[in-house]
Amino acid sequence: MMNKKGREQDKMIVLAGMIGVGKSSFTEMIARKLGTEAFYEEVDNNPILDKFYEDPKRWAFSLQIYFLNKRFRSIKQALHDANNVLDRSIYEDALFTRVNNMQGNISDVDLDIYNDLLANMMQEIDSLPKKAPDLLIYLDASFDTILAHIKKRGRSYEQVDNDPELLEYYELLYSQYEKWYEDYNYSPKIKISVDEYDIVENPENEEKVMEIITNALEEARKN
């Protein structure tokens, strides 16, 4: 568990990564180990998500606006409280919107509207006393691992069986993540391989993962 010094140092950590990579599992573990609050992406109460998978051209823009609003609220609360872990954040939102534009699910006009709204939100975030996370953790895994995780968690609308268009969406999204991570510059960042450090099937990896995260936080505080 966290020592007294750790408790005195508030921290905000955001996770990022492909659908199905394991963000919620890592978020729960990190929050538990650090004694912080976990913020999870809403799935079960999302009124649009399953509709998007059924008809992405009809619902992609609405879904991204829905997520943007929710994540804007979450990031403001998290930056205000400054002692928490988020399993996804506003910093990734534009990636999903851009991929949907590339696939023709979101028009260029709607993409411009979205980007303008996002820019306004980021400007407001920049005016807050705490402007960015202390650390972003990008979870990486092979595409086969991603598909295995999606299949295992069993959400019917996420399954690629007999749905080549959904598989293409996953493949395109997956292909864009490495550059997104390279371009991310709002805060210190690290990459953790879920293939190497699987904490679900191998809980003994938790301590090594926390060592990596703790070292990254300490290094970030020096700079």
Where are these predicted regions, by residue range?
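Phosphate-binding P-loop
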Residues: 2-10
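Hydrophobic anchor at the beta1->P-loop junction of P-loop NTPases
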Residues: 15
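P-loop (Walker A) phosphate-binding loop of NTP-binding proteins
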Residues: 18
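Conserved lysine of the Walker
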Residues: 23
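Hydrophobic positions on the alpha1 helix immediately C-terminal to the Walker A/P-loop
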Residues: 26, 30
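Conserved substrate/cofactor phosphate-moiety recognition/catalytic segment
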Residues: 32-71, 95-99
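A glycine- and Lys/Arg-enriched "phosphate-lid" helix/loop adjacent to the NTP-binding pocket
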Residues: 96-175
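NTP-dependent small-molecule kinase module
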Residues: 151-223
